[in-house]
């Protein structure tokens, strides 16, 4: 999970992709195909927009509380700015409240609830994280909401044996994941969920998930309140309840100790379930031990309250082996998914030989191929089945029964492992997939689109579209298309590092659905690809590099992307008007 490397510097990124040179792509043509031209709104000479001294890592959001579209930008130094959607000019801005003498890091994408922006950020003293905080901005009033005092997160959980405890430790906790909102009965504001891993893999660290009761948070500030104060932090999940993390290597993930960080940028995923909701929590590398309730490198399904029961068969799992878990055991788990190869799959074989004679789970840990780097997507099938599609940093994609997570229907390796003996992987810790799939339906068949990347010059990468089909009543993956096509030399030049997250839209009711993504380079490129056939229908070079793992915002036929100027490291939002041209 060596995630910090590209958050605050683009230098490593351009080492990886700077050798690829310029790439020319032609807009694909077919009968009655829409083509799209992207006209820059800002920054331009007329609308220079605004730039920021630090990166924009969180995804931009849309605010309509002022009766006009404003683009909310959360800068990593704690500035929250509202930009005019047409000109890029600052309508208003505010700073995250921070103790005097300390600095701010704001990485997680905030969440909007009823014209209130909830932000999660961390405060540093001389470079050391001292606290993690939540604050609320009243978007209508353009100010901090005084009814929500700044909330400093803290927690302490017992180990499984009940003898020791684990405290939430700010210096080794880091908030990468987007804040998530969920409803609560008889509550206007519901719950907010804040997830943590670490900025790298330095121990001791764990995965933490905080459940924040928004009504209780506000009630605790009411001077007229007569009844006892409620608990704002209503519940906390700890993924690896170990009080000791005895590692001998620089990074604990390789030894499968502690860890289990919740760090995927899209955050835990929340879906309706009966009369409530369920939360799917993907975790990163670390320790997995069912008896000790350690759940690194898994997907956990939880309900409100965050009380977790894996619901695995106790007899089948009595002698659980973290390196070679019994297939019958892990298939028995209702609320826990543990990744594994299919019986006929070829073992992972990095060219370095680092995984020779290693089990699959051991290889994932050694190579830093977290399952939890990506977020799952839930899809309802025509036959009534619901499935999860979960990518992994190792280049594979899992197809899982969403009601019984232990059931793995399929696994498909959609991109090769980075590097060869003569073409060393530039940044092997990145893996080959960090994303969240987007999905749609074509002719009643579910389609998922998954971005891949490879930091070498040998293996093709790009967006991969898969159909989910039924074979003998069982869901399976079926390859649909890949952009660029693997036979195209561009497939060896594009997508050499983390791209943006993908997003889907259609420009009119009669138009085809398009998936949009930003490939990062000295000057990044927006690509629009038609989902029904994988045809390239739009391409636009950015003024800046773009921003890895940020989701483009599309509103009213405008697309807004976070970007950074490599020469100055100034961050900005770039905006383009999507215009349709019929052939």
Residue locations for each model-derived region?
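Intrinsic disorder/low-complexity signature
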Residues: 3, 21-23
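Bacterial N-terminal signal peptides
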Residues: 9-20
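Extracytoplasmic/lumenal domain signature
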Residues: 23-56, 62-73, 78-104, 111-117, ...
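Bacterial N-terminal signal peptides that target proteins for export
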Residues: 1-9
């Amino acid at each position: 999970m060596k995630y910090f490397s590209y958050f605050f510097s683009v230098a490593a990124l351009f080492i990886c992709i700077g050798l690829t040179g310029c790439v020319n792509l032609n807009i694909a043509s077919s009968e009655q195909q829409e083509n799209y031209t992207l006209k820059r709104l800002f920054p331009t000479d007329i609308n220079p927009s605004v730039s920021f001294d630090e990166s924009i890592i969180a995804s931009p959001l849309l605010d309509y509380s002022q009766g006009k579209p404003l683009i909310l930008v959360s800068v990593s130094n704690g500035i929250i700015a509202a930009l005019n959607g047409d000109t890029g000019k600052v309508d208003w801005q505010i700073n995250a409240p921070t103790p005097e003498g300390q600095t701010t890091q704001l990485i997680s994408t905030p969440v909007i609830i009823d014209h209130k922006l909830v932000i999660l950020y961390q405060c540093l003293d001389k470079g050391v994280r001292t606290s993690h905080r939540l604050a609320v901005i009243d978007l209508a009033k353009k100010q901090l909401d005084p009814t929500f005092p700044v909330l400093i997160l803290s927690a302490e959980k017992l180990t499984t044996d009940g003898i020791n405890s684990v405290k939430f430790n700010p210096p080794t906790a880091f908030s990468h994941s987007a804040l998530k909102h969920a409803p609560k009965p008889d509550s206007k504001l519901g719950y907010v969920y804040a997830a943590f891993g670490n900025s790298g893999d330095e121990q001791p660290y764990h995965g933490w998930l905080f459940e924040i009761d928004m009504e209780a948070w506000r009630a605790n500030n009411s001077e007229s309140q007569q009844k006892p104060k409620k608990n704002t932090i209503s519940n906390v999940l700890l993924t690896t309840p170990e009080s000791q993390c005895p590692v001998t290597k620089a990074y604990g993930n390789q030894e499968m100790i502690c860890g289990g960080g919740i760090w995927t940028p899209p955050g835990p995923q929340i879906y309706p379930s009966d009369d409530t909701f369920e939360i799917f929590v993907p975790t990163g590398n670390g320790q997995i031990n069912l008896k000790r309730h350690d759940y690194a490198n898994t997907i956990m399904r939880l309900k409100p309250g965050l009380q977790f029961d894996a619901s695995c068969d106790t007899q089948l799992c009595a002698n659980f082996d973290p390196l070679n878990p019994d297939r019958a055991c892990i298939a028995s788990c209702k609320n826990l998914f543990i990744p594994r190869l299919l019986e006929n799959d070829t073992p992972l074989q990095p060219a370095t030989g680092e995984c020779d004679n290693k089990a699959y789970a051991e290889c994932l840990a050694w190579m830093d191929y977290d399952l939890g780097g990506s977020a799952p997507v839930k899809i309802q099938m025509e036959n009534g089945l619901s499935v999860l599609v979960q990518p992994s940093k190792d280049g594979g994609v899992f197809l899982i029964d969403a009601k019984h997570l232990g059931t793995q229907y399929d696994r498909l390796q959609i991109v090769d492992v980075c590097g060869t003996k003569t073409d060393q992987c530039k940044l092997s810790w990145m893996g080959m997939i960090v994303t969240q799939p987007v999905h749609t339906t074509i002719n009643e068949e579910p389609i998922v689109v998954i971005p891949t990347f490879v930091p070498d010059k040998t293996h093709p990468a790009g967006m991969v579209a898969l159909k989910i089909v039924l074979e003998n009543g069982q869901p399976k993956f079926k390859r649909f298309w890949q952009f660029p096509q693997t036979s195209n030399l561009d497939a060896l030049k594009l997508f050499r590092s983390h791209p943006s997250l993908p997003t889907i839209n259609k420009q009119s009711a009669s138009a085809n659905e398009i998936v949009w993504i930003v490939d990062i380079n000295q000057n990044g490129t927006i690509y629009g690809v038609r989902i029904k056939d994988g045809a390239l229908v739009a391409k636009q070079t950015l003024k800046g590099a773009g921003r890895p793992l940020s989701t483009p915002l599309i509103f009213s036929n405008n697309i807004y992307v976070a970007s950074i100027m490599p020469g100055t490291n100034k961050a900005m939002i770039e905006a383009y008007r999507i215009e349709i041209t019929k052939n």
